[in-house]
């Protein structure tokens, strides 16, 4: 699974309240949520992301309250993947379960510049930035299968169909 696109960078400790503020949690429409993703840091983020972007961030991306809407809003906004030095565990699982690739890369914000164009091999974790190849942690096994299906619900539907035949 190869993903590519331009980079938008954020720092450390981007919590779920920044990704999608609590006042929007009563809404369920992914496209509505997308309009408010990262709003506290950049009210125009959703316009930039709509072209298809890769977020590069620092440590503990997605920390804070367990909020599935964070992954849903990012994906709906046009975020193709998130590369970070580390992730909050619950965000990591929510991202995979919603079909949003998340790649762990040491020193991510030092290695990749804003507006760089990156190409990511999700399975191996290799990230091509210009002529440089960076080695992140890839996604394999069932997590990769869930991503390839488009998320946990699509994966379960697929498995149900396979088991019926």
Swiss-Prot record:
<comment type="function">
    <text>Catalyzes the isomerization between 2-isopropylmalate and 3-isopropylmalate, via the formation of 2-isopropylmaleate.</text>
</comment>
<comment type="similarity">
    <text>Belongs to the LeuD family. LeuD type 2 subfamily.</text>
</comment>
<protein>
    <recommendedName>
        <fullName>3-isopropylmalate dehydratase small subunit</fullName>
        <ecNumber>4.2.1.33</ecNumber>
    </recommendedName>
</protein>
<dbReference type="GO" id="GO:0009098">
    <property type="term" value="P:L-leucine biosynthetic process"/>
</dbReference>
<dbReference type="InterPro" id="IPR033940">
    <property type="entry name" value="IPMI_Swivel"/>
</dbReference>
<dbReference type="GO" id="GO:0003861">
    <property type="term" value="F:3-isopropylmalate dehydratase activity"/>
</dbReference>
<keyword id="KW-0028">Amino-acid biosynthesis</keyword>
<keyword id="KW-0100">Branched-chain amino acid biosynthesis</keyword>
<comment type="subunit">
    <text>Heterodimer of LeuC and LeuD.</text>
</comment>
<dbReference type="Pfam" id="PF00694">
    <property type="entry name" value="Aconitase_C"/>
</dbReference>
<comment type="pathway">
    <text>Amino-acid biosynthesis; L-leucine biosynthesis; L-leucine from 3-methyl-2-oxobutanoate: step 2/4.</text>
</comment>
<dbReference type="InterPro" id="IPR000573">
    <property type="entry name" value="AconitaseA/IPMdHydase_ssu_swvl"/>
</dbReference>
<dbReference type="InterPro" id="IPR050075">
    <property type="entry name" value="LeuD"/>
</dbReference>
<keyword id="KW-0456">Lyase</keyword>
<keyword id="KW-0432">Leucine biosynthesis</keyword>
<dbReference type="InterPro" id="IPR011827">
    <property type="entry name" value="LeuD_type2/HacB/DmdB"/>
</dbReference>
<dbReference type="InterPro" id="IPR015928">
    <property type="entry name" value="Aconitase/3IPM_dehydase_swvl"/>
</dbReference>
């Amino acid at each position: 699974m190869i993903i590519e696109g331009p980079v938008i960078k954020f720092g450390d400790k981007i919590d779920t309240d920044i990704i999608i503020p609590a006042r929007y949690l009563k809404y369920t429409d992914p496209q509505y949520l997308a309009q408010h993703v990262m709003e506290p840091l950049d009210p125009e983020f959703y316009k930039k992301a709509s072209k298809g972007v890769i977020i590069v961030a620092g440590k503990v991306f997605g920390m804070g309250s367990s909020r599935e809407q964070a992954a849903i809003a990012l994906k709906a906004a046009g975020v193709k993947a998130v590369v970070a030095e580390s992730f909050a565990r619950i965000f990591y699982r929510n991202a995979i379960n919603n079909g949003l690739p998340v790649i762990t890369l040491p020193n991510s914000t030092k290695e990749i510049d804003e507006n760089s164009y990156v190409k990511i091999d999700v399975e191996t974790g290799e990230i091509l930035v210009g002529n440089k190849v960076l080695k992140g942690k890839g996604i394999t096994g069932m997590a990769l299968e869930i991503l390839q299906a488009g998320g946990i619900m699509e994966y379960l539907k697929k498995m149900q169909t396979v088991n019926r035949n």
